[in-house]
C-alpha cells in the first residue's frame, strides 16, 4: 500500500500553530516559500489566539 504524503501547506499551518503555543516569535518562521510562509503565519496567529484565550496570558 502506497503511503500518501501530507499536504505541505497543512503541515506548515500545524507547525505555526504549535510554535505559537510554545510562545515562539513569528520571526522564527522556518519557511522560505511564500505560500508555506503564509500558512505558517496563519497557524501562528490561530495558535497565539488560542494561547491567550486559554488563560495562558501569564506566559507571554
UniProtKB/Swiss-Prot annotation:
Location within or outside the cell: Cytoplasm
GO biological process: regulation of translation
InterPro entries, A to Z: Ribosome_modulation_factor, RMF_sf
Source organism, top-level taxon: Bacteria
GO CC terms in record: cytoplasm
This protein's UniProt keywords: Cytoplasm, Translation regulation
Tagged with keyword Cytoplasm: yes
HAMAP family per record: RMF
Record's function text: During stationary phase, converts 70S ribosomes to an inactive dimeric form (100S ribosomes).
Family as reported in the entry's similarity comment: Belongs to the ribosome modulation factor family.
Protein name: Ribosome modulation factor
Name of the coding gene: rmf
Amino acid at each position: 500500500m502506497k503511503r500518501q504524503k501530507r499536504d505541505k501547506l497543512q503541515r506548515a499551518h500545524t507547525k505555526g500553530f504549535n510554535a505559537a503555543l510554545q510562545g515562539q516569535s513569528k520571526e522564527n518562521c522556518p519557511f522560505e516559500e511564500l505560500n508555506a510562509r503564509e500558512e505558517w503565519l496563519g497557524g501562528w496567529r490561530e495558535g497565539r489566539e488560542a494561547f491567550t484565550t486559554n488563560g495562558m496570558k501569564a506566559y507571554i
